[in-house]
């Protein structure tokens, strides 16, 4: 990276990590569910994955790759009913959020507390069960805390690896690909498909991750550092995809 480029922010490292989620994806539908995953998906489309299909988040397929919140020429129609067809085909990669994730990848975005008498209602399970069963799923967590990365989720919305019956063909497409947080990049490549650290963002220590995770993180001592963006990637993030710096509202460090 050249000396003319200003210091890379934590949010920009997160954007790069989210873009790398789609590395090698090819011609599939990218469905990012928050600002930084959206920047990441569009960055991937402008660099390594030009065949990614992206939408406005409602019902229109973009012909171009606009900035966050901007309009662009439309090349197709993707109403909700067609999304179900894409989900069932497996040609989609969703990046969802999570209110809770456990070491096996079970995700909760439904409610806190007992199933029959929750103490706080959230979104409901939404599309999480179908997403996790049918196609690659990743998660984005903007604030990595022990409340989110917990021992046991209150309600399973997205299906984790300990729920899988390997003999049942219904689970054959289950694949939890990545978890990106404001502290690092993770997957479920630990023992018995448990949570594993792949890289920590520059300035983040292993102790910080351990202190903000309720369970042991596999591979934490050996995790590398999240890669540096290229000059072109930084230009695209700052000038093309997010000129209003919305990314810094999601991750401010």
UniProtKB/Swiss-Prot annotation:
Effect of residue 126 to M: Loss of activity
Pathway terms, separated by semicolons: Steroid metabolism; cholesterol degradation
Molecular function, one GO term: lyase activity
GO BP, sorted A to Z: cholesterol catabolic process
Disruption-associated phenotype: IpdAB double deletion mutant does not grow on cholesterol or HIP, but grows as the wild-type on pyruvate. In the presence of cholesterol, ipdAB double deletion mutant accumulates COCHEA-CoA.
SUPFAM superfamilies from the UniProt entry: NagB/RpiA/CoA transferase-like
Residues of the signal peptide: none
UniProt keyword terms in alphabetical order: Cholesterol metabolism, Lipid metabolism, Lyase, Steroid metabolism, Sterol metabolism
EC number in record: 4.1.99.-
InterPro entries in the record: NagB/RpiA_transferase-like
Impact upon substituting residue 92 to M: Loss of activity
Effect in UniProt of substituting residue 58 to A: 20% decrease in activity
Chemical reaction(s) catalysed: (3E)-2-(2-carboxylatoethyl)-3-methyl-6-oxocyclohex-1-ene-1-carboxyl-CoA + H2O = 6-methyl-3,7-dioxodecanedioyl-CoA
Task of the protein: Involved in the final steps of cholesterol and steroid degradation. Opens the last steroid ring of cholesterol by catalyzing the hydrolysis of (3E)-2-(2-carboxylatoethyl)-3-methyl-6-oxocyclohex-1-ene-1-carboxyl-CoA (COCHEA-CoA) to 6-methyl-3,7-dioxodecanedioyl-CoA (MeDODA-CoA).
Family: Belongs to the 3-oxoacid CoA-transferase subunit B family.
Oligomeric and partner information: Heterotetramer composed of 2 IpdA subunits and 2 IpdB subunits.
Name of protein: Cholesterol ring-cleaving hydrolase IpdB subunit
Upper taxonomic lineage: Bacteria, Bacillati, Actinomycetota, Actinomycetes, Mycobacteriales
Gene responsible for this protein: ipdB
């Amino acid at each position: 990276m050249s000396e003319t480029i200003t210091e890379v922010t934590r949010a920009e490292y997160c954007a790069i990590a989210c873009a790398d989620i789609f590395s090698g994806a090819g011609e599939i539908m990218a469905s990012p569910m928050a600002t930084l995953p959206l920047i990441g998906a569009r960055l991937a489309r402008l660099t390594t994955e030009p065949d990614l299909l992206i939408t406005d988040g409602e019902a229109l397929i973009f012909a171009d790759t606009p900035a966050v919140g901007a309009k662009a020429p439309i090349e197709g129609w993707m109403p909700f009913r067609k999304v179900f067809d894409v989900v069932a085909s497996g040609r989609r990669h969703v990046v969802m959020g999570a209110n809770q994730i456990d070491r096996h990848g079970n995700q909760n975005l439904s409610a806190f507390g007992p199933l029959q008498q929750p103490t706080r209602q959230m979104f409901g399970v939404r599309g999480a069960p179908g997403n996790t069963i049918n196609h690659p799923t990743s998660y984005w967590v903007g604030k990595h805390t022990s409340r989110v990365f917990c021992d046991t989720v209150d309600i399973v919305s997205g299906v984790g690896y300990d729920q899988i019956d390997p003999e049942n063909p219904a689970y054959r497409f289950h694949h939890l690909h990545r978890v990106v947080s404001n502290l690092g990049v993770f997957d479920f490549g630990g023992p018995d498909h448990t949570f594993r650290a792949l890289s920590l963002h520059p300035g983040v220590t292993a102790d910080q991750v351990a202190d903000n995770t309720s369970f042991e993180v596999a591979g934490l001592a050996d995790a590398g550092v999240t890669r540096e963006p290229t000059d072109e990637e930084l230009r695209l993030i700052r000038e093309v995809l997010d000129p209003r710096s919305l990314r810094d509202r999601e991750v401010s460090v």
